[in-house]
C-alpha cells in the first residue's frame, strides 16, 4: 500500500469484502460453506485470494483477441481459475457475431460468466439475439463438458497448474508453441484456438 508499509491492497480489499459477505450471510441466517471472491486482475500476487477475471472490458473484436492471449497466460502468474465478462462489460453494440464468438471462447475458460453494465444498449440474454440457436448450443456444450471440467479442476487443485495454459507448458521444446500466443490448452486434452475476427463479408 502506498499508505502503509508492507500492506497489500489486494489482501486488505478481499479481507474486508469477505468479512462483509460473512457478516451479511450470518445476519440473514445463511452460512456459506464454500465462499468465493471474484476479483479483477490486481497484479502479481493477487492470485492468492480470489478467482480472477480480466476486469471491465470493452465489447470489441480487438478486446476478444487480446483476451485470448491474456487467458492463455493467466497460469504464468498463478491464476488457476480465470475468467472475463463474456461479451464485454461496456461500450460497443449488440453484435451477434461478436457475442457468439466470445461465448464460444468462454466455454473453454474455467469461469463461464456473461456480464455487462446495466444499460439498455447492452444485452447479454442469449434468447434476445437472432442467432439464439447457435448461442444456446455453446451453452449446452459447456454443460456437456462438466465431467471434463471437474477432472481438470481436480488436477488444478492437485498440481497448482491452471486449467488454461500456454501451449509451451505442454511442448516446451517446440519453438512454435511460443509463437501462437492466442491459442491455449484447456485441461490436458483440448487445444483452443478462438476466433476473434469477424467473418469476411460480414
PLM regions and their residue ranges:
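Catalytic-domain carbohydrate-binding cleft regions of carbohydrate-active enzymes
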Residues: 1-202
Amino acid at each position: 500500500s502506498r499508505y502503509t508499509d508492507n500492506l497489500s491492497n489486494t489482501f486488505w480489499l478481499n479481507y474486508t469484502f469477505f468479512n462483509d459477505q460473512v457478516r451479511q450471510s450470518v445476519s440473514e441466517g445463511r452460512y456459506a460453506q464454500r465462499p468465493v471472491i471474484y476479483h479483477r486482475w490486481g497484479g502479481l500476487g493477487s492470485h492468492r485470494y480470489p478467482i480472477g477475471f480480466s476486469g471491465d472490458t470493452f465489447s470489441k473484436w480487438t478486446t476478444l483477441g487480446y483476451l485470448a492471449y491474456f487467458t492463455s497466460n493467466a497460469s504464468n502468474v498463478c491464476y488457476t481459475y480465470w475468467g472475463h465478462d463474456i461479451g464485454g462489460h461496456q461500450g460497443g453494440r449488440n453484435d451477434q457475431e461478436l457475442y457468439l464468438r466470445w461465448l464460444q471462447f468462454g466455454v473453454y475458460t474455467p469461469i463461464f460468466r456473461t456480464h455487462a453494465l446495466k444499460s439498455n444498449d447492452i444485452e447479454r440474454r442469449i434468447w434476445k439475439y437472432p442467432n439464439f440457436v447457435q448461442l444456446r448450443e455453446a451453452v449446452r456444450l459447456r454443460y456437456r463438458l462438466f465431467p471434463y471440467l471437474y477432472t481438470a479442476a481436480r488436477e488444478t487443485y492437485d498440481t497448482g497448474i491452471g486449467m488454461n495454459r500456454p501451449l509451451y507448458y505442454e511442448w516446451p521444446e517446440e519453438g512454435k508453441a511460443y509463437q501462437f500466443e492466442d491459442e491455449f490448452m484447456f485441461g490436458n486434452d483440448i487445444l483452443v484456438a478462438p476466433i476473434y475476427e469477424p467473418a469476411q463479408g460480414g
